[in-house]
């Protein structure tokens, strides 16, 4: 993000010589933020000492500090901010008792981080990407024009290098900073969820679900916006890079294009990585909740439930239930949710038969059915077979049953239409919209 021609030893020596230091306790930081908010409402951006004292009085009241020493403490706080270069003080022989104060770039940067940069949205990102797209497109058109007319270095620095360096690169840095703040927001949400899980379960589960859904939605909306613009931006950068190939005098543009491509790749890859990490955390939270309920072993939780039902008319409550479809979505490939460790101890009437037992039953039945069709040399229409067989199984078993049936069918023969290169039509196999695409098996092994 930071581009400088100075080396690390030079910067270290520079900071050491000037004795730079930052010390902002909570009270001083609150004072600086209050100054920034007040300054934003003024047209001239200038403040006098009485303004700063009034602002400090509000901060002091919030921290419940003594009112008798406000003038002295306000003067000390102002001097500290001036000394640390958060404020500039201007005075002359004509205005000795009426100094003027302005926020320094450091003061603006720190306050802007805590105030404005906390607000991040897909709309703001879309506007930034639109500005970047216009700047890069205009620069690419001027680059192609400069190549055609054999323009000099001054033309390239003014019309191509300058927009990319001072507009596009700065917006990329702003997006990168916003993404880093999103990382902090995710961490704070994790801490909030951890705190909720130690409190009342009814409120905790609902609040955790809301926080998880909101964050997941924001990340996906963010990534969709980045993906939509990323390819176009890379294409425009490549257009400019093609124009400077073979031009040794334009090495600075080629280097800048390489840096911008790296920044853009980092911005886009961050979005997908953040989504993947959040999905893993989402699963971890749900697993934690399931484990906590499972450790209850149908005793404490059930006792609380019976007690709540007994006292319902004295203290009415809402019952939160989960949709069956969503539970199916949470199932992983290893069928972990069906294991005893995930479900806990269930009554016998609620236990399901093991998938291996079901697999053997379906294999035996389908072998007898399909082999009979092969002996009669009858074609096997998988869509019809699947539709007939799935009617006898619950929806949660449809995927497993269909996979077993297809596996047994393809072992018996093949479809001659597969060699023609044509695609079969999609056929529905249940009343929930599931479809299969397969040719009729008419050649047996």
From Swiss-Prot:
GO terms for cellular component: cytoplasm; nucleoid. Belongs to the MukF family. Its main location: cytoplasm. InterPro entries: Chromosome_partition_MukF, MukF_C, MukF_C_sf, MukF_M, MukF_M_sp, MukF_WHTH, WH-like_DNA-bd_sf, WH_DNA-bd_sf. It is found in: Cytoplasm, Nucleoid. Interacts, and probably forms a ternary complex, with MukE and MukB via its C-terminal region. The complex formation is stimulated by calcium or magnesium. It is required for an interaction between MukE and MukB. GO terms for biological process: cell division; chromosome condensation; chromosome segregation; DNA replication. This is Chromosome partition protein MukF. Involved in chromosome condensation, segregation and cell cycle progression. May participate in facilitating chromosome segregation by condensation DNA from both sides of a centrally located replisome during cell division. Not required for mini-F plasmid partitioning. Probably acts via its interaction with MukB and MukE. Overexpression results in anucleate cells. It has a calcium binding activity. Keywords: Calcium, Cell cycle, Cell division, Chromosome partition, Cytoplasm, DNA condensation. Pfam families: KicB, MukF_C, MukF_M. The gene is mukF. GO terms for molecular function: calcium ion binding. Residues 212-240 are annotated as: Leucine-zipper.
